[in-house]
A protein has these predicted regions:
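N-terminal leader/targeting peptides and immediately adjacent processing regions
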Residues: 26-27, 40-45
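Secreted/extracellular small peptides and ectodomain modules produced from precursors
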Residues: 5, 17, 33, 157-160
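Short, Lys/Arg-enriched N-terminal segments with co-localized hydrophobic residues
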Residues: 1-19
Length: 169
């Protein structure tokens, strides 16, 4: 039985490493675009901004989820994998916010109108989420599972609060 667990852990780790390499390449491209152009100039059409923010939020959720799975004991804790996911999370957590500009409230989006009606409240929620995710990143890089566990709860609550207030189900 122990051999099966060991094999499973190795397979999960290898899968995570393969996914990480592909994700790092994608994030690198996204990051390059994000840094190369002013926020509004990035998007030729509102649909482009919506796609961009949805993609960056999806990547952010994937890496947060991987860290959460380790914190919850659903997958074995691996300090290197945690740090690698944290590196991606640190970059991606900065990306989606510029894509909530004017005209991006319509189309294929679950964004609520409150994002634009209560823009200061939305900015505060986004800033809080980024701050909490920064704590997750720092905790993951320590290699200490307990530190990661402690940081995940507040970050998850921050994400949930933003979703509850600003995202349609």
């Amino acid at each position: 039985m122990q051999n099966v667990r060991d094999c499973t852990a190795v397979i999960i780790t290898q899968f995570q490493e393969i996914c990480m390499k592909k994700t790092i390449a994608i994030v690198g491209l996204l990051g390059g675009f994000a840094c190369a152009l002013p926020a509004q100039a990035q998007f030729a059409k509102p649909e482009d901004a919506i796609k961009y923010r949805k993609s960056s939020l999806t990547v952010m959720a994937a890496h947060f989820g991987r860290l959460g799975a380790m914190a919850q004991g659903k997958v074995p804790f691996d300090a290197k994998v945690a740090a690698d996911n944290a590196d991606v999370l640190a970059t991606v957590a900065k990306l989606p916010w510029a894509a909530f500009g004017e005209g991006t409230d319509k189309g294929e989006t679950r964004a609520k109108p409150e994002i634009w009606k209560e823009s200061a409240k939305f900015k505060d929620a986004a800033d809080k989420a980024q701050a909490e995710l920064g704590k997750v990143v720092a905790a993951a890089k320590t290699g200490n599972l307990d530190a990661l566990k402690a940081a995940m709860g507040p970050a998850g609550s921050s994400c949930k609060a933003c979703h509850d207030n600003f995202r349609k189900d």
